[in-house]
Amino acid sequence: MEETLRVLVALAITIFLVILRFEAEKFGAAEYDEPSRDGHRGSFFRRLSWILLGFALVGALLVVHPDPAADLGVALGDRGEALLLGFGFGALGMFQAAAYALFRYGRIRLPPAWTYPGAVLNGIGTAFVDEATFRGAILGLLLLVGINPVTAVVTQAFVYTLATRTGAPGRSHYMFVLTLVGGLLAGLLTVVTGAIGAAFLAHAITRISVFVCTGHAGQPARRGEEIEESWEYRAAPRGWHLIDRQDDDGPSKR
């Protein structure tokens, strides 16, 4: 009876984790760690609070559930296997991020140096919360009730994609596909290894690589809408006057 009650409480915590993921935009965290149109970022402490709240809920899940490592896979797993598969799939994530940046911008669009610490914290924190929630709790509970592993992996990937809202109107198609495929591959890694260690490592590397290559945490602008593609960026600074030279005799008179 006590064990059943603890599993039900763990299920309730999982639901709160999914709700928290839905609310990432309000915190300016995860894919939404982006500056506004006027160039201002949300409060660092608001973004940090989302990560800390996620960590707290995952911690509560580990305490409440009778056996989170065996049933939910919320553990590193075999260290060598986790490192090998994590870095292997992480390398694929780096490659696709660079390929997308070269296709979209014609170059690697490195972000300003001062944004790296916050982006790395956001990437690692988001990867841990996501993997513990979707590849750990949700996938583990689906497998625990006897659902076929393939069906369970596909189900958690779709739930994950819905929770990130990357398929909403106006959002990047690239991020939608990356989120869905990433969820499927991370689920597969978790089933194969029996833990989320490899999936977490690959996820964190991929998320940080997308930021480094595109300058975005997860919301690449549509063509013509990046700051360097805007008319304001290409125009002369306010107060400057352009001189139109028609020939070598000097400026034209207008």
Regions found by a protein language model. Give the residues of each.
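Membrane-helix interface/capping segments
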Residues: A69-G73, L102-R109
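N-terminal pre-catalytic segment of deacetylase/amide-hydrolase enzymes
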Residues: H40-R41, F95, A99
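Glycine-/small-residue-rich active-site loops that bind phosphorylated ligands and cofactors
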Residues: S49, R79, D130
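N-terminal, membrane-interfacial amphipathic/helix-forming hydrophobic leader that caps
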Residues: M1-G73, L144, V150-T151, F211-R254
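Alpha-helical transmembrane segments
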Residues: E2-T14, G77-L92
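Short alpha-helical transmembrane interface motifs in multi-pass membrane proteins
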Residues: R41-G42, L53, E81-G88, G118-G123, ...
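Hydrophobic alpha-helical segments of integral membrane proteins
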Residues: T14, V58-V63, G90-A97, G187, ...
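Transmembrane helix-loop-helix hairpins at the membrane interface
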Residues: I15-V18, A98-A101, Y105, P112-K253
